[in-house]
């Protein structure tokens, strides 16, 4: 067969939840590309939810905080060059209470996240990035706001919340609390409590959190931190900025992206949707590799003319037990089928 021109590939990927980290996925793609003589830049990405801390350098500190239901929790976070990166799930996450079944959706508090922010301030952080996602809480951030004793110091800090959703403040209960174990009656109670929290923030801090897109992230934590002066930023944009995504995209011939499950939410600010959009704007060919692709997402990909593969469809149960191998095989198959990417 004709020797293929080497292609510069950008592996800009999210985690495959439960089976492979974003870094492992990027590595698998790179190994497959390199075995065929192509160059590959590995760029693990995240959307502000779980996995963001890992993508932005990983934790280098551990603190004891109060977990969502009052029990002590050991939270990992990062402080480097006066930039703190805090993943709220480490302090106030649903996984700390054993999932929805072990949660008390009404009692669950963000106090531990506030304690981490307070500690970051005490240690001299000049920039604080709070990543939301995976929360047990719908307290509107009241627990965190109370725990931040040094909030006057926040005025001189670049304070950013990386939001993984665009949900509005008062909608947080109805949209997400059922996944955190809330009954219908509790959802109504939590909605009323969010209304009260919004009134409180407006009266005390002069900030109308109801008007902010993304303020409902992590059960309204994003809104509470916005009341203290945080900027709410789409998580993907923040991560892409930190890791130099735009420059890497401009420099490549082909983009490969992917995540564990592709569905309608993938196009609402999540990694794959954003990478597909960016590649389209830059007129770069793109391949999407996912564990599973639901029918809506499949239709969207067809409409956009984007090459896509579902591992589950092609490899069955191996897609879960040997995810990175399946990813590498998919990449190799694609590169052989489509020799001329340019």
Role assignments for model-derived ranges:
Residues 2-342:
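N-terminal loops that bind phosphate or other acidic moieties
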């Amino acid at each position: 067969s004709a020797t293929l021109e080497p292609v510069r590939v950008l592996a800009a990927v999210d985690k495959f939840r439960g089976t492979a980290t974003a870094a492992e996925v990027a590595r698998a793609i790179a190994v497959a590309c390199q075995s065929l003589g192509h160059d590959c830049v590995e760029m693990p990405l995240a959307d502000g939810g779980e996995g963001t801390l890992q993508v932005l350098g990983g934790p280098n500190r551990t603190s004891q905080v109060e977990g969502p239901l009052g029990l002590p929790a050991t939270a990992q976070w990062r402080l480097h060059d006066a930039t703190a990166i805090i993943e709220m799930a480490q302090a106030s996450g649903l996984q700390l209470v054993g999932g929805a079944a072990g949660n008390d959706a009404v009692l669950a508090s963000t106090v531990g996240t506030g304690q981490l922010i307070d500690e970051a301030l005490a240690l001299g952080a000049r920039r604080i990035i709070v990543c939301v996602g995976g929360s047990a809480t719908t307290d509107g951030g009241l627990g965190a706001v109370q725990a931040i004793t040094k909030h006057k110091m926040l005025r001189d800090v670049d304070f950013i919340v990386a939001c993984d959703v665009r949900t509005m403040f008062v909608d947080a209960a109805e949209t997400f609390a059922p996944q955190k174990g809330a009954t219908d009656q509790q959802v109504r109670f939590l909605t009323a409590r969010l209304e009260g929290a919004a009134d409180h923030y407006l009266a005390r801090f002069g900030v109308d959190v109801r008007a902010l897109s993304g303020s409902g992230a992590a059960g309204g934590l994003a809104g509470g931190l916005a009341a203290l002066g945080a900027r709410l930023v789409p998580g993907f944009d923040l991560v892409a900025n930190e890791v130099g995504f735009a420059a890497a995209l401009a420099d490549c011939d082909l983009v490969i992206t992917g995540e564990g499950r592709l569905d309608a939410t993938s196009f609402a600010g999540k990694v794959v949707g954003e990478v597909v959009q960016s590649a389209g704007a830059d007129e770069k060919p793109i391949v999407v590799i996912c564990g599973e692709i639901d029918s809506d997402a499949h239709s969207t990909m067809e409409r956009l003319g984007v090459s896509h593969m579902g591992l589950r469809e092609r490899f069955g149960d191996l897609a879960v037990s040997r995810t990175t191998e399946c990813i590498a095989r998919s990449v190799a198959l694609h590169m052989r089928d489509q020799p001329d990417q340019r």
